[in-house]
């Protein structure tokens, strides 16, 4: 029972993270100035702990920056 609850919580967390990063990607697509290489100054590198995909240079977050 505990394992089932943990798996459900993990899947829900992953879904929220994916929806959040998808929204950020759409926003960057609408505003071309955000896609410039200069924007990487304030972002976190691959392997850094994150809460949101916007924090990562690659835009993908799953507890740590993926790219």
From Swiss-Prot:
Residues 1-24 form the signal peptide. Its main location: secreted. Pfam families: Conotoxin. The presence of a 'disulfide through disulfide knot' structurally defines this protein as a knottin. The cysteine framework is VI/VII (C-C-CC-C-C). Belongs to the conotoxin O1 superfamily. Keywords: Disulfide bond, Knottin, Neurotoxin, Secreted, Signal, Toxin. Residues 25-37 form a propeptide. It comes from the Eukaryota. GO terms for cellular component: extracellular region. Expressed by the venom duct. This is Conotoxin Cl6.6b. The keyword Secreted applies. The keyword Disulfide bond applies. Disulfide bonds join 43-57, 50-61, 56-65. It is found in: Secreted. GO terms for molecular function: ion channel inhibitor activity; toxin activity.
């Amino acid at each position: 029972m505990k394992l089932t609850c943990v798996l459900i919580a993990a899947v829900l967390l992953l879904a929220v993270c994916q929806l959040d990063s998808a929204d950020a990607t759409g926003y960057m697509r609408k505003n071309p100035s955000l896609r410039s290489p200069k924007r990487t100054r304030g972002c976190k590198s691959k392997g850094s702990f994150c809460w949101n995909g916007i924090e990562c240079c690659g835009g993908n977050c799953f507890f740590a920056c993926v790219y």
